């Protein structure tokens, strides 16, 4: 039976923190564009976050396996609230790049460690349901944030969005500080024992397939988050509120279907779910190229969200199973989160180059190509192991 107290604390703390981030991040491309940033610099703003997070993810993930989850979670959330103040004080594009780099360090302490904590308390056979339910905090926070950010920006100012981010991150920090049990009471697997070697984790074909799929799927998200606001603002002349709605839709729809798809992942072939979801999301990326109205983008964003909502619970269920078997939940989850970070970096920066060299709409084609590659590689790695349940010795 899952520990409902810990689960609820992590759920609401992450929801508050991610909502705060969601308020600010979709407006950063427009904010940077107003400072004179081109496509490459917009890509760097998102890429800087991914670089710092990717470097430190394995370190914090493995260390949390040995030292406990709570210290990393509360420090990371406190740093998020400090970063919001820095955003409010920034005056040029370089400031934004540096701040996002520091924010990536804080994120490396939060996301993989929180998900590993949930994995620690997940009962066997309930991986899909548990991770699907928990992922709702992430996806719904990211979806509500952009809408709130657009409304706050239109009604007040961009500086007000930074204040909201800081307050919500502080709320997440206080919830975890007060309600999570002390580190000594955590069910951390490794207590003075040597952790499983990285080469053993990386050599597992299922983990490799999960990593590459997560990388390519998130590259598509990087393109959307970085350049859909620019497309909607520059070419379609939409308001900040409507831009926020468009960015929100994909993650909102994905969040809604997380729980039913998670339950389904506990009952059927998880490989099939990942492949079907990936193909739907890739098709949506191609359709973004032909955007001509708010209504069209509305429908395509929903389609992308459905694809992610089908794939991600099954993907995370496989990852949690692997983490439990290896007694290295933090290490396995941090590796997948690294794929997420690298995908966001490659997607946003690659799309920025495509925008500067060719055309803004070509950026979405790049995302589609990467996603099709990810689906194919995932199928190759798991073709003989459709519902993996073992870890190499």
Predicted segments with their positions:
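Juxtamembrane intracellular "pre-TM" segments in multi-pass secondary transporters
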Residues: 1-3, 181-211, 393
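Short amphipathic helix-loop junctions that connect adjacent transmembrane helices
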Residues: 27-39, 226-241
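Helix-breaking motifs and short loop linkers at transmembrane-helix boundaries and internal kinks
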Residues: 36, 68, 89-95, 237, ...
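Structural signature of the two symmetry-related core transmembrane helices
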Residues: 71-85, 166, 272-286
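Intracellular juxtamembrane helix-capping segments at the cytosolic ends
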Residues: 109-122, 310-324
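C-terminal membrane-cytosol helix-exit motif in multi-pass small-molecule transporters
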Residues: 167-186, 377-382
């Amino acid at each position: 039976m899952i520990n409902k107290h810990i689960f609820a604390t992590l759920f609401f703390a992450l929801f508050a923190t991610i909502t705060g981030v969601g308020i600010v991040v979709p407006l950063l491309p427009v904010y940077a564009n107003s400072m004179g940033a081109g496509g490459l610099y917009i890509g760097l703003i998102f890429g800087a976050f991914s670089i710092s997070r990717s470097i430190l993810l394995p370190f914090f993930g493995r260390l949390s396996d040995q030292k406990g989850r709570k210290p990393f979670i509360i420090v990371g959330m406190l740093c998020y609230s400090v970063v919001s103040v820095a955003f409010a004080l920034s005056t040029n594009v370089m400031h934004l790049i540096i701040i996002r780099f520091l924010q990536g360090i804080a994120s490396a302490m939060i996301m993989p460690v929180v998900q590993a904590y949930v994995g620690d308390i997940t009962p066997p056979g309930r991986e899909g349901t548990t991770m699907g339910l928990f992922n709702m905090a992430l996806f719904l926070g990211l979806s509500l944030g952009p809408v709130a950010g657009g409304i706050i920006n239109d009604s007040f100012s961009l500086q007000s969005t930074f204040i909201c981010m800081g307050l919500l991150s502080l709320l997440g920090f206080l919830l975890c500080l007060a309600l999570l049990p002390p580190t000594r009471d955590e069910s951390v697997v490794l207590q003075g024992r040597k952790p499983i070697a990285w080469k053993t984790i990386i050599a597992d074909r299922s983990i490799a397939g999960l990593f590459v799929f997560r990388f390519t799927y998130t590259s598509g998200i990087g393109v959307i988050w970085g350049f859909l606001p620019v497309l909607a603002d520059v070419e379609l002349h939409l308001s900040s509120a409507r831009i926020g709605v468009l960015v929100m839709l994909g993650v909102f729809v994905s969040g809604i279907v997380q729980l039913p798809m998670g339950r389904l992942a506990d009952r059927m072939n998880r490989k099939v779910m990942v492949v079907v979801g990936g193909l739907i999301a890739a098709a949506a990326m191609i359709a973004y190229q032909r955007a001509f109205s708010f209504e069209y983008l509305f429908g395509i964003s929903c389609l992308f969200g459905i694809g992610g909502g089908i794939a991600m619970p099954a993907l995370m269920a496989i990852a949690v199973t692997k983490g439990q078997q290896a007694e290295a939940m933090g290490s396995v989850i941090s590796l997948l989160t690294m794929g997420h970070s690298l995908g966001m970096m490659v997607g946003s920066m690659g799309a920025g180059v495509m925008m500067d060299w060719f055309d803004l709409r070509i950026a979405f084609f790049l995302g589609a190509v990467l996603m099709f590659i990810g689906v194919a590689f995932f199928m190759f790695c798991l073709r003989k192991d459709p519902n993996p349940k073992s870890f190499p010795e």
